[in-house]
């Protein structure tokens, strides 16, 4: 018996203006496309009987590049008015007030509950890891954003930590989060999104001590986690712009279990392959699908940082 879906991760575009060093999008995406609004409604129609409480409208693309992203957010709230809606953006596009993209961005905030600004590193390290991002373009974005009506949308900085940008964290707190009145600095240890690869190391003992002593309260993720704790297999859904269903955002390189435009989500979740992955996690005996899960690989490091 499957539990109802309470968490949805929905990709509505796979267009992106960056090639981030930690992203595997080139390995996993198909033809570039934006999901048409009629297909999007069709997808939500097939999910509306599930009690979705939280959702992320993002994936392997930059969400705001969808030409109707404000409508995407509005329509989602029509189907799931009580769901908490999260979106992440790379801030590498113009949002000057009065422009088409600027108006789309501001209109979207009427429906988004939490907006992540993805900013990893400072100047040189930022441009290195988020190539071809430009620091100057980010600053122009933030200056234009500063004067916008946020409505009731909470806005935070989401920072992916790697061994080469640890020392930039304090600068981002001081010069971005504080100056532009962002809610918090969320720190996420870099994760690997491929099924057949493990996470690289590279952190020094000094790095770990610094993160523990200064930033442990900002670091997200569970320090005590095992496969049987995975919520994705029981209550989550990850869908691509084509409608393909995958188990989670931790393994975007996996083969899909089905397609929402061909079969219902309930039928897909009953397939043998889907059930094998689910049972494997629930019994703490994971299949090859989950063998390199970064949740599992991160747990010891998060334990050290959060608990010493």
Residue ranges and their predicted role:
Residues 4-5, 63, 153, 300:
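Proline-rich low-complexity regions
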Residues 11, 30-38, 70, 79, ...:
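Radical SAM enzyme [4Fe-4S]-AdoMet core and its adjacent flexible, acidic
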Residues 1-21, 52-58, 234-243:
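N-terminal pre-triad scaffold of radical SAM enzymes
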Residues 15-18, 25-28, 37-121:
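Conserved SAM/AdoMet-binding glycine-rich loop
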Residues 22, 232, 292:
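Short, cysteine/histidine-rich loop/knuckle motifs that typically chelate Zn2+
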Residues 21-24, 127:
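A short local structural element in Rossmann-fold oxidoreductases
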Residues 23-26, 249:
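Kinked, hydrophobic transmembrane alpha-helices enriched for aromatic residues
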Residues 1, 307-308:
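Short intrinsically disordered terminal tails
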């Amino acid at each position: 018996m499957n539990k109802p879906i309470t968490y949805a991760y929905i990709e509505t575009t796979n267009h992106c203006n960056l090639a981030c060093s930690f992203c595997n999008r080139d390995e996993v995406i198909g033809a570039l496309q934006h999901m048409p609004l009629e297909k999007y409604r069709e997808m939500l129609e097939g999910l509306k009987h599930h009690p979705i409480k939280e959702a992320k409208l993002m994936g392997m693309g930059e969400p705001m590049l969808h030409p109707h992203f404000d409508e995407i957010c509005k329509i989602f709230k029509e189907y799931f008015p009580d769901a908490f809606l999260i979106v992440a953006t790379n801030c590498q596009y113009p949002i000057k007030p009065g422009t088409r993209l600027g108006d789309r961005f501001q209109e979207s905030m009427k429906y988004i509950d939490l907006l992540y600004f993805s900013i990893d590193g400072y100047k040189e390290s930022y441009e290195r890891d988020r190539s071809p991002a430009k620091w100057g373009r980010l600053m122009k974005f933030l200056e234009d954003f500063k004067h916008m009506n946020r409505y009731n949308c909470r806005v935070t900085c989401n920072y992916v930590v790697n061994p080469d940008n640890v020392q930039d964290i304090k600068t981002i707190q001081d010069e971005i989060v504080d100056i532009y009145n962002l809610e918090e600095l969320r720190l996420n240890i870099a994760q690997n999104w491929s099924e057949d690869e493990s996470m690289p190391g590279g952190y020094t003992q000094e790095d770990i001590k610094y993160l523990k002593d200064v930033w442990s309260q900002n670091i997200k993720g569970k320090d005590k986690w095992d496969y049987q704790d995975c919520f994705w297999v029981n209550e989550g859904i990850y869908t691509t712009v084509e409608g393909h269903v995958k188990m989670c955002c931790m393994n975007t390189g996996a083969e899909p279990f089905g397609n929402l435009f061909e079969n219902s989500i309930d039928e897909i979740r009953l397939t043998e392959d889907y059930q094998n992955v689910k049972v494997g996690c629930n019994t703490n005996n994971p299949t090859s699908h989950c063998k390199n899960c970064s949740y599992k690989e991160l747990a010891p490091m998060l334990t050290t940082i959060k608990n010493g």
